[in-house]
Swiss-Prot record:
Lineage, highest ranks first: Bacteria, Bacillati, Bacillota, Bacilli, Lactobacillales
EC numbers, comma separated: 4.2.1.126
Domain of life: Bacteria
Keywords linked to the UniProt accession: Carbohydrate metabolism, Lyase
The protein's enzyme class: lyase
CDD domains xrefs: SIS_Etherase (cd05007)
Pfam family membership, one: GKRP_SIS_N
Protein name (Swiss-Prot/TrEMBL): N-acetylmuramic acid 6-phosphate etherase
GO molecular function: carbohydrate derivative binding; carbon-oxygen lyase activity; ether hydrolase activity
The species this protein was found in: Lactococcus lactis subsp. cremoris (strain SK11)
Amino acid sequence: MIDLSTLTTERRNDETFNLDQMTVKEALVKMNNEDKKVAYAVEEVLPNIEPVISSAIEAFNKGGRLIYMGAGTSGRLGVLDAAECVPTFGVPATQVVGLIAGGDKAMTVAVEGAEDSLELGRQDLIDLNLSENDLVLGIAASGRTPYVIGALDYAKEIGAKRASLSCNLNAEISKHAEFPIEVDCGPEFLTGSTRLKSGTAQKLILNMISTISMIGIGKVYNNLMVDVKPTNEKLVERSKRIIMQATDCTYEEAEEKFNEANQDVKLAIVMLLTDCAAEEGKTKLVKANGFVKNTLN
């Protein structure tokens, strides 16, 4: 039998014992007060997040991937963060990957027993052709999900880097990772509902890992997402605005270079900043490893 009594995420919150008796306003205030604790809890583990980001940058530079593994809410958050990297940073969907126990179906409905399988976590990475250049980040609020542990153990066999993210101290998955992150947000507002504070903490940390690792491989210039992919009308206009912000050019100039660059925002910026044609701009970016700033030297 699994003993959940030692897990912070399963403890009852002293502040919400009478939750069912609260008015809507009282419950809102209590919930908001609990949520305020999350960012401070994340702040405590920044030193543990830093090496994970460094490892992700190293993986990308070797042609490897960042692979999120989780079940339930943890898995869904990984899939969400991975999916957002494609339009935001212009990376292929294969570079940041989110895997959830039970597969795509588990994004919307619970898949019975999927998270309890060590073998399933292993098999999902085999199917992904895991390599030693990859970084596997196992996510589990409880810190004990077998699916995640199976994945981390297989990653060790292959020689891939291993990180973990849990919301309990002394988590089991931490023993299976080189770079463990244990963020303690205290008991949930609703006992055991880890989609709340734990999920929020996980989302904040995944945001940090994906965003800052992308900065580390040249996907950002100043604080602008210069590799954004203009896949809809809103993003086309945002792309032109980014070009204007990066170069202090007019809308008309931004639009002209955007089109000359075949809607490549980063290339258009380099063309404007260095006064060059598209082909020369491409060469400059290759030599600069994709960093806009390095094309200006």
